[in-house]
Amino acid sequence: MLDLKRIRTDFETVAQKLATRGVSEDSLNHLKELDEKRRQLLVSSEELKAERNLSSAAIAQAKRNKEDASQQIAEMQKMSADIKAIDAELAEIDEKVTEIITVLPNTPHDSVPVGADEDDNVEIRRWGTPREFDFEIKAHWDLGEDLDILDWERGAKVTGARFLFYKNLGARLERALYNFMLDEHAKEGYQEIITPYMVNHDSMFGTGQYPKFKEDTFELKDSNFVLIPTAEVPLTNYYRGEILDGKDLPINFTAMSPSFRSEAGSAGRDTRGLIRLHQFHKVEMVKFAKPEESYEELEKMTANAENILQKLNLPYRVLALCTGDMGFSAAKTYDLEVWIPAQNTYREISSCSNTEDFQARRAQIRYRDEADGKVKLLHTLNGSGLAVGRTVAAILENYQNEDGSVTIPEVLRPYMGGAEMISPK
């Protein structure tokens, strides 16, 4: 959530930055008008309360002197009624302010490229060279079925579209991947966490999913629970409402969890395969950092995600997302896209973001600065390290062989009992 004081004191800058994210100045002007009205009413309310206190003292004195205080009592009753009316108007304005400010996205960092959509993202670097095949390659969904390791037909029967069963060495490959990812992040100083897979509405608000993106989630009916769309939500909210010791920062968390997404608005996109599912595993990284260190931590987090792809020897590229393509809470985001041979393109496999104090303000996560003793909002960061199903897709396609088999990447073999190949039965 943006700082209302910042909007008030630096309106033009905030308006200019949000315009690059598609926010009209009209909504900001309305917010500014409401804020000004609110401040005027607060002044009026305080003045009336001060007058009422004086009147109350005068009435008490008149009664002690056995003087008639009926006029003063009537005036005080009118003041009380006026205060009540102002308080009611303030509550109404506060509600309107909340409605606007809670759906405004974060302001982009100065280094973020300005653009409308994914076409305006800027490629930063590439790693690895896409393999040249001398045979007709298969898509990962065909490989999965031919190798008897992925079953979409029964997934659709048991649940519905965009669900599947992993089986045999497919299940083991998935498990090997997330164990490998967690182990790699642990080496980099991340604390491993097993989170709840349901959170309450306050947690969804804290990380910015609620109220704006409610339609993208799976809520449990007649409850305060939501299935997590990412482990970012429980990990970030771990410290919601707390004050941390500055000397303990940065704090790094990692967790593997299922992620549940309704994929509202994705009809017709990636209807086959592992790219877009309602339920998938993802290894998440979350950091809590001091403001002056958060962009250095973003580079480290991105490197941690890249490390996984490099050790798996999967070609990828890194993009700096433009203002029009960034997520709601992000101030800056790097996307990692892995090479998918059957689609002859790179597809997103990780997104690493610095939200600055946007989530911390919503979730009230603060730290005590050891330098001056003051309590301040910290910065939160989050990143995929990696989306496991998409990594399975990338391995199946990049490591496929002419005979229909798939070679298991060397770093995963210790996690798969030494198996080197997934072969057709």
Swiss-Prot record:
Catalytic activity, EC: 6.1.1.11
Enzyme class, first EC level, given as a word: ligase
Entry keyword set: Aminoacyl-tRNA synthetase, ATP-binding, Cytoplasm, Ligase, Nucleotide-binding, Protein biosynthesis
A GO BP entry: seryl-tRNA aminoacylation
Segment forming the signal sequence: none
Pfam entry (one): tRNA-synt_2b
Entry binding sites for L-serine: T230, A231, E232, E284, S384
GO terms for cellular component: cytoplasm
Major localization class: cytoplasm
InterPro entries according to UniProt: aa-tRNA-synt_IIb, aa-tRNA-synth_II, aa-tRNA-synth_II/BPL/LPL, Ser-tRNA-ligase_type_1, Ser-tRNA-synth_1_N, SerRS_1_N_sf, SerRS_core, tRNA-bd_arm
One term of GO molecular function: transferase activity
Keyword Protease: no
Domain of life: Bacteria
Compartment list: Cytoplasm
Subunit structure: Homodimer. The tRNA molecule binds across the dimer.
The record's note on its domains: Consists of two distinct domains, a catalytic core and a N-terminal extension that is involved in tRNA binding.
Name of the protein in question: Serine--tRNA ligase
Source species: Streptococcus uberis (strain ATCC BAA-854 / 0140J)
Gene that produces this protein: serS
